[in-house]
Amino acid sequence: MAQVAANGARQPLLQLLRGPSGKLWEVCIGLEVHAQVLSRSKLMSGSAASTLSSARPNRNVSFFDAALPGTLPVINRECVHQAIRMGLAVDATVHPRSLFERKHYFYCDLPLGYQLTQQRAPVASGGALHFELPESAVVSEHGGAHSDEATFDASKYKSRKEKNEALKKWKAKQAKKQQDVISRSVRITRIQIEQDSGKSNHDLEDDSTVVDLNRAGTALLEIVMEPDLRSPVEAGQVMRQLQHLLRHLDVCDGNMEEGSMRCDLNVSVRPTNLGAEADVESLHNALTARTAAPFGERVEVKNMNSIRNMMRAAEYEARRQIALIEEEGGEVHRETRSFDAVTGETKRMRSKEGAKDYRFFPEPDLPPLVFSEKLIQEISERMPELPEALKERLCAQYDLTSYESLVLVNEPGAAPYFETVAAQNSRPSKVVVNWVLNDLFGHLKAVNGDIASSPVTATELGALIDLIQDGTISGKIAKDVLELMFYENEPKKTPLQIVEEKGWKQIQDPEEIRALCRAVLDDPKAKKNLDAYWKGKTQLFGFFIGQVMKQCGGRVHPELANSIMQEILEEHKQ
């Protein structure tokens, strides 16, 4: 996939796919997300809201859920409040009046024969979901109109010196890309409340189908987005951001693998009428001109149970449409397809229904939902600090980079953990964020854990950082202490107790350090290196310090060791 950054790297990226003929195509992706609302009971009945497939089948089913004649719906107030929270979080307009409608279709796991939804008068509409994409996540699949080097090509350089200098610049560029983020947003069309269906199980030995109605009637939030996304990478990041926001608000647990958060894709493509030889400006002009070709017919893709599979489905479907047009001369028709995670392909299910097919009409058994300004204000005041505001505050208050704040906010529990550690002024925020993001996260990743399951509390990590700051231990020793705290701290010991038991306190006595330095330089084996040092090979200074560290297991205060070694070398010179 080629990327074109029009008018500078901070502009939205135009991400293109190359077709079989070499022509570049633009991809358009829209998302519809269904999130099961966290609530004790279902949307229209008092039955327990069941989100786990492990629950006993048909245990949490009321008469209304089973569509027994004469039963009436009773709206769950908490589910409605959850929808308002979500609308406020994305700066949508929360409408003072909304309506439920019946959407008719016939599945064996939909007892009513219709779904209660909000097609024409949703709880909220408009707004946008803001997200940030690490620049390093945008990877070119080939050269072409624009491509950044993803790997270092050593064959371009004749001499070792040229290669080393180029490699150094390349590494610096890659490090900067890792820290840089691209800010984007996707517009929200509407946020509506609706009922979930039951669950059909077709995987039986006798080819029969059984129906579990535990899920039937569970409250869903349908979040419909405008087709603003231009790559599977963007779509994946939007899903991660939405998943994090839903969890942050405690609206949905966001577990796609368990079906509590589901996503439908709408994918279409259009040609740029330009080939690989086109420059960045030509591509930008072609794609933004009024004469640009419209996007083709969209295809809906269902059945993705993870963000990774959603991204795979988006890319496959875009390539399928391009190949259909270029190689077969065919047309893309509006249809619904499913994604096969095993083959990585989308497969036709049915032609796409329109609004007329569903025969929408107002729900006669439910009055309109009416929200006062006072209610909306009360819900707003009870909401937690939103991720976007939290990122901005972390950057301003602690002088973090956009990338650092992005990682802290997107990892559940990481931002409060960081702020607890950094609470005391003696702990520099840059030191703290490095220990959290690099060292602590490294151990958590190794055991597939998260902040909530970390055996090292924020207070304990802060105490460890204090030992570095006051010179009790070196940064290198601190890493060893953290490893013991993480994997072998039973019974529980403080960082200081571990340091004292292991004898790892840093040597800070100048006379003791001076004796260690003299021992290294007075060693007959050091004469050759000393001669080389005086002849200009000053990088051997690091070797001498390394020998000092080796003598005492790395416990010497590095700054004192450097200073004293420099003094002794000057004495030797005289």
UniProtKB/Swiss-Prot annotation:
Compartments (UniProt record): Mitochondrion
Annotated EC: 6.3.5.-
Membrane-spanning intervals of the chain: none
SMART domains noted in UniProt: GatB_Yqey (SM00845)
EC top class named in words: ligase
Catalytic activity: L-glutamyl-tRNA(Gln) + L-glutamine + ATP + H2O = L-glutaminyl-tRNA(Gln) + L-glutamate + ADP + phosphate + H(+)
Species of provenance: Phytophthora infestans (strain T30-4) (Potato late blight agent)
Keyword Nucleotide-binding in annotation: yes
Alphabetical UniProt keywords: ATP-binding, Ligase, Mitochondrion, Nucleotide-binding, Protein biosynthesis
Protein name in UniProt: Glutamyl-tRNA(Gln) amidotransferase subunit B, mitochondrial
Top-level taxon: Eukaryota
Miscellaneous notes: This protein may be expected to contain an N-terminal transit peptide but none has been predicted.
A GO-annotated cellular component: glutamyl-tRNA(Gln) amidotransferase complex
Its biological purpose: Allows the formation of correctly charged Gln-tRNA(Gln) through the transamidation of misacylated Glu-tRNA(Gln) in the mitochondria. The reaction takes place in the presence of glutamine and ATP through an activated gamma-phospho-Glu-tRNA(Gln).
Assembly mode: Subunit of the heterotrimeric GatCAB amidotransferase (AdT) complex, composed of A, B and C subunits.
Gene Ontology BP annotations: glutaminyl-tRNAGln biosynthesis via transamidation; mitochondrial translation
PANTHER family noted in UniProt: GLUTAMYL-TRNA GLN AMIDOTRANSFERASE SUBUNIT B MITOCHONDRIAL AND PROKARYOTIC PET112-RELATED, GLUTAMYL-TRNA(GLN) AMIDOTRANSFERASE SUBUNIT B, MITOCHONDRIAL
Chief subcellular location: mitochondrion
GO MF term set: ATP binding; glutaminyl-tRNA synthase (glutamine-hydrolyzing) activity
HAMAP family with a match to the protein in the record: GatB
Similarity comment: family membership: Belongs to the GatB/GatE family. GatB subfamily.
